[in-house]
């Protein structure tokens, strides 16, 4: 592979070690070119599903499908529902009934326009929100929804239409709710972190 020529050493063997099934799962596909149905890939995912990090996250889910707080999918960071599902997707976890319960809970946060906010809508007015400043949240949701095989769901189509629709050609990106509240934190007007997350999510669609 051409990219290996610029490295001081070939890390492939290390990345394929059995002790980290998530890294092995992705390396087999992205570096070795093995298809998802390849026996080695499926075996790595089987091991991943029983790994301590995955079991800890799945076991923390509440019976209703959420993690931590039902009304807030975002806080506390890295433990709440959207973070838990994102981490599981990034690790390479497969879709299961537990995952499906979590995703159905996430869809409760979707507004009529297709986008997501962190709090459950309590009124028709709240569900009618068309806030166009949360590309990072929408992108994270799209990433794990795509990973878990929901792209044909009409609710996801609405999300995709919303994301594409609020891209700013003039500013070459997506606006962030932190600008201009704190201009020093995000510059320029479009958010490079939100754009990176959005492009990553869109890249999963084939």
What are these regions (language model features)?
Residues 1-206:
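Preference for long, amphipathic alpha-helical scaffolds in soluble/luminal domains
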């Amino acid at each position: 592979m051409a990219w290996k020529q610029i490295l001081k050493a070939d890390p492939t063997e290390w990345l394929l070690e059995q002790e980290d099934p998530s890294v092995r799962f992705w390396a087999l596909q992205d570096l070795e070119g093995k298809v998802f149905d390849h026996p080695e890939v499926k075996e790595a995912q089987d091991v991943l599903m029983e790994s301590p990090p995955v079991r800890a996250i799945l076991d923390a889910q509440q019976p209703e499908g959420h993690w931590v707080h039902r009304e807030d999918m975002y806080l506390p960071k890295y433990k709440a529902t959207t973070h838990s599902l994102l981490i599981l997707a990034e690790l390479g976890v497969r879709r299961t009934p537990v995952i499906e319960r979590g995703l159905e809970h996430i869809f409760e946060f979707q507004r009529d326009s297709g986008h997501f906010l962190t709090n459950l809508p309590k009124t028709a007015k709240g569900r009618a929100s068309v806030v166009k400043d949360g590309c990072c949240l929408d992108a994270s949701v799209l990433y794990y929804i795509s990973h878990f095989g929901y792209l044909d769901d009409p609710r996801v189509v609405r999300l995709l239409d919303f994301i594409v629709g609020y891209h700013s050609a003039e500013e070459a990106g997506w606006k962030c709710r932190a600008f201009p509240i704190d201009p020093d934190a995000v510059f320029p007007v479009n958010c490079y972190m939100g754009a990176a997350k959005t492009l990553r999510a869109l890249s999963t669609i084939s």
